[in-house]
UniProtKB/Swiss-Prot annotation:
Protein name (database record): Protein TsgA homolog
Superkingdom assignment: Bacteria
Gene name linked to the record: tsgA
Organism: Buchnera aphidicola subsp. Acyrthosiphon pisum (strain APS) (Acyrthosiphon pisum symbiotic bacterium)
Family to which the UniProt record says this protein belongs: Belongs to the major facilitator superfamily. TsgA family.
Localization terms from the record: Cell membrane
Amino acid sequence: MTNINRIGLTWISFLSYAFTGALVVVTGMIMGNISNYFHLSISQMSNIFTFLNAGILVSIFINSWLIEIISLKKQLIFSFILTIIAVIGIVLCNSIFLFSINMFILGLVSGITMSIGTFIITHLYSGSKRGSLLLLTDSFFSMSGMIFPIVTAYLLEKKIIWYWSYICIGAIYLLIFLLTINSSFEKFKTNTKNSKETKEKWNFNVFLLSISALLYILGQLGFISWVPQYATEIMNIDIKKTGSLVSGFWMSYMLGMWFFSFIIKFFNLYRMFIFLTSMSTILMYCFIKSENFLNQQYIIISLGFFSSAIYTIIITLASLQTKHPSPKLINLILLFGTIGTFLTFIITSPIVEAKGLYVTLISSNILYGIVFFLSILIYFNKKYERVI
């Protein structure tokens, strides 16, 4: 494989996460504008995230088998066509039902592309290089989540209608399409053939890592989703100031992924997993117990930094459980992570209603604690001793 082709495929992986990040963040940002457009309340618009997440969940689930039937290149080209159809549908639709269908289609595209992006990195690179590039790939989700709100805010400020945000997001997939038609995917055809011929045996750590992915994402989103309301209602902090907590978390999260992508090769991944989950659990507890807003700002920035590499390390460790990680193995972790996202408000909303915001954040902290416990189990249960 030529170096230029490898770079092109790597950028497809980067942009696949950027596409999903922009889609998720922008949809939440313009929900008020969308509800006004369709003359609905904000609560009635909540099904947008349900359809979007359902699309991502379904596509990641079926892509494990789809990849053995349809080549990666054809999937990406077909996904580009679906993106065009969905964006045009969003622009032209005049009912919330049609809008929800188009969001489901974008969710399908997002899930397929993200799983392909992860699969590409795990098969192009190995060892510490794989871990570093998976972290760098994941950082494009956060980077896109920072850039596109600025673009969207500019469009809305200029009185440009909200659906232009989705047209801009579609431009990311145009870049993916251009890279796809100019790249060779022959290496992956051989890999998928080999995975059919040799049955992959998964050890118990694969199950533990899958559960870790679900609990980590559920704990993270359950925490960060309710932090603004917690700071406002429990801490009596001005609503404008609470935004700095969330933005500080995601900024340090992105910087943390960049930092760990460079230093991860010097450490054992199993021990790094234990260290980061323990630090994150302690920092989250300190945030919840703190009664000083300035301290909370420092703590949540530290939390974002130390928790940034956990999910990618889970994916990397899963890929190292077998000699030749299959699409099914990688998609299993992504599937459990997506289930965690899907369950966030389904699980946390009843807790908020019944027990309050404090108990909800404590519940997220407990989930982080369980992931820390699982990281220790995974360390002692590892099948292969690898220093990475």
